Amino acid sequence: MLTEFHFDEFYLGSDELDSENAIFIHKKIIDLWKDFGCLVYPNIKKSDYIDWVNGLDPKISKLWLVAFSHYKKTPMASNYMPVSDFQTPLDIEETYSSDELDLIIIPNNSSLINEISCTTHNLEISKTNGIIDSTSFANSKSLCEQDIAEGDSIDDILDKRFKKLIKNSKVITIIDRYWAKNHVEDISRRKPALLKILDFIYSLKQKIAITIYTSNVDSADDYKEILSNYVNLTLKRTVNFSSFILSFEISICDDSLFREQGHDRYIAFDDKVCTLGRGIAIFRDYPVPNCTFSIKDINHTQFNSILTKLSKNRKAVI
């Protein structure tokens, strides 16, 4: 799960971010952004943010420039006003409601709230001193590390663990040894897991590219005929698929390769990798079973090396 957070273009000029020990605060915010966050910012003010960054100590400025270049961020949908112009937390929540913000960070000397932090309905507002104890980031960390329990609601899993990852990603890459086998089994019997995921993407009106790597286990023709027919005669004929799925590709690899390279099952959302013990079978039309679960930065996983190996050894591409 991601925490969608915001600070206005004046925040980086705060007194506490210009002190001798400020590098600790800067690093903490940047690390939380990297691991669990997505910055929501007004596109019209992007240059103002960079101007403030360039005015910082060079060592700190370099860290922020990396963050703005590589970490997850998304333009603000609401009509923008600087946080410093608001009188109450409720005013902020109402103005920024369409952005579904989780957290706003404000300077320590802000009069917007009297406490170090407060939560108004679903929006947490935290002064700099409270960022270490942010409930939003703590919740994101917990959901990134907590396994899925038997009987959990699949709709809750999608909403709490995947919604903001999907909202803030351009490419989903799935590595799941048994996806093709399960999908073919489900086509005529129940709603396939893939359709559950696609319907959720459609509900978010998110345009995204999807790539799936799976094995040819129990298939004489590498599932080419049945999957080609499904993609071309079922998926591509729907309005939602045409509207929101920018590209869709299925790669079939020999099952022996998965035994060696891809035993674990992954869903990558750009540079965030979800490891799912049961793969996307968790979304099949069955009661939810116990399932190991984690989300990590792609550089802390073997995802890229496994993907490279699979990409070089495809038996069929659909």
Report the location of each language-model feature.
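Short amphipathic alpha-helices and their capping/turn segments at secondary-structure boundaries
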Residues: 158-165
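Secondary-structure "cap/kink" motif recognition
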Residues: 165-171
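Short acidic, Gly/Ser-rich segments with clustered Asp/Glu that frequently serve as metal-coordination loops
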Residues: 179-180
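PLD/PLD-like phosphodiesterase catalytic module centered on the HKD motif
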Residues: 1-154, 184, 191-318
